[in-house]
């Protein structure tokens, strides 16, 4: 028997109500905030991610799904969504459309990580990107958008963490301070951190092992230049002006190399150690880094699987998916079948979800199946009903059965559904 690849999931049944709920809320909200959708390929040239995400990041070093195609090209399944959107922005000449430009995306990403609850090797993200603005008001609106998304889907128990990574000059000074600090503890660091110390000392702040050393490390906010500090203070003031609650976290650096100035994460308080459900920030140098013009940009992404865990942790009630509000049962020959299928199409054209008997079972078995699929009403058509130009409608909750003239079936069913809501 064939089995799915480790770290992947088959999604179906009752679980899909969470996916529909999040995807619809996210897309509708993005449009309200002025974003247009963008869809990029799920694989790109490997060098795009090495250049954008960073050669020394865990994603590039350990987690990317990379292969050589039949043309000898190195190809990688996208591990995150920002780099492909930026590549499209540069390659397709989107800069000519003026600024700001705002795009959202939703789709699968791939990372070779240890599978665990809410973290799979194929996972799904909703993300949003803004191109063209260097103003703190863009950072504020992005964080407000992320906060509003959490509220729209029904979450309450989360916290927004923010920080500033400053400009290149600020980070040079900060890296020197970190190097000096961690040099005193180098022999006690975990093996990964010893490598990070040499390649990218900022990554030490991500470590979940050497937490005690991280607590006492220098804070980047103490090394911000005047422009970065002004930008950060304005961001906080703008968030305060609309009542957004946040926590300043000077250890927050994010796991990708392209960030500068604003970074933020959203953590859910009921998900334990792996509590991050969203994150993002500003990446002003990335577009130029991959061959475009010097255009400021920022964005965020949230993992849909992580959001579903959070919804379940809070016992959030989401809309049920009703695929069989009405079930059509029938007994008889071809004319009865034809009437049943005509009736099903009439109801569907009115926007009513309809299940049609496809197995040609006895009436008792059909009614059992109607109950199994959760039908609210079952329409019964037989030879006698066809001759009299009527149908029987059974309320599956109360057991009540009514006769409807054929010409009034659709309007009658619509009225009955309305009364139940």
Swiss-Prot record:
One of its GO terms (molecular function) is ATP binding. Disulfide bonds: none annotated. One of its GO terms (cellular component) is cytoplasm. Its EC number is 6.1.1.21. Belongs to the class-II aminoacyl-tRNA synthetase family. Homodimer. It is found in: Cytoplasm. PANTHER family: HISTIDINE--TRNA LIGASE, MITOCHONDRIAL-RELATED (PTHR43707:SF1), HISTIDYL-TRNA SYNTHETASE (PTHR43707). Its main location: cytoplasm. It is an enzyme of class 6 (ligase). It catalyses: tRNA(His) + L-histidine + ATP = L-histidyl-tRNA(His) + AMP + diphosphate + H(+). One of its GO terms (biological process) is histidyl-tRNA aminoacylation. CDD domains: HisRS-like_core, HisRS_anticodon. It comes from the Bacteria. This is Histidine--tRNA ligase. Keywords: Aminoacyl-tRNA synthetase, ATP-binding, Cytoplasm, Ligase, Nucleotide-binding, Protein biosynthesis. It comes from Fervidobacterium nodosum (strain ATCC 35602 / DSM 5306 / Rt17-B1). PROSITE patterns: AA_TRNA_LIGASE_II.
């Amino acid at each position: 028997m064939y089995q799915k690849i480790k770290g992947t999931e088959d999604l179906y049944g009752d679980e899909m109500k969470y996916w529909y709920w999040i995807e619809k809320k996210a897309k509708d909200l993005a449009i309200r905030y002025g974003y247009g959708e963008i869809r990029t390929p799920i694989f790109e040239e490997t060098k795009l991610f090495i250049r954008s995400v960073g050669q020394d990041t865990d994603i590039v070093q350990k987690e990317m799904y990379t292969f050589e195609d039949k043309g000898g090209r190195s190809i990688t399944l996208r591990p995150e969504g920002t780099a492909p959107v930026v590549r499209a922005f540069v390659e397709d000449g989107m800069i000519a459309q003026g600024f700001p430009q705002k795009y959202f995306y939703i789709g699968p990403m791939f990372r070779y990580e240890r599978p665990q609850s809410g973290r799979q090797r194929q996972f799904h993200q909703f993300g949003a990107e803004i191109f063209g603005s260097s103003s703190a008001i863009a950072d504020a609106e992005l964080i407000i958008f992320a906060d509003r998304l959490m509220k729209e889907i029904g979450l309450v128990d989360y916290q927004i963490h923010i920080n500033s990574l400053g400009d290149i000059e600020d980070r040079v000074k900060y890296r020197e301070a970190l190097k000096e600090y961690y040099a005193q503890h180098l022999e006690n660091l975990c093996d990964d951190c010893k490598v990070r110390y040499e390649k990218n000392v900022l990554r030490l702040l991500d470590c979940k092992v050497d937490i005690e050393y991280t607590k006492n490390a220098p804070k980047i906010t103490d090394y911000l230049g005047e422009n970065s500090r002004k930008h950060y203070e304005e961001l906080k003031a703008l968030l305060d002006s609309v009542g957004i609650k946040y926590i300043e976290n000077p250890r927050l650096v994010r796991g990708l190399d392209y960030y500068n100035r604003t970074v933020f994460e959203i953590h859910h308080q009921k998900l334990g150690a792996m509590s991050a459900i969203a994150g993002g920030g500003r990446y002003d140098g990335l577009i130029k880094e991959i061959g475009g013009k010097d255009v400021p940009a920022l964005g965020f992404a949230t993992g849909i699987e992580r959001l579903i865990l959070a919804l379940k942790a809070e016992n959030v009630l989401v809309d049920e998916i009703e695929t069989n509000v009405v079930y059509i049962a029938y007994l008889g020959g071809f004319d009865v079948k034809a009437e049943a299928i005509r009736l099903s199409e009439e109801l569907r054209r009115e926007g009513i979800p309809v299940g049609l008997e496809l197995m040609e079972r006895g009436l008792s078995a059909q009614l059992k199946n109607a109950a199994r699929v959760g039908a609210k009403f079952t329409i019964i058509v037989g030879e006698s009903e066809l001759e009299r130009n009527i149908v029987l409608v059974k309320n599956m909750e109360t057991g009540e059965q009514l006769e409807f003239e054929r010409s009034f079936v659709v309007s009658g069913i619509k009225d009955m559904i309305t009364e139940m809501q």
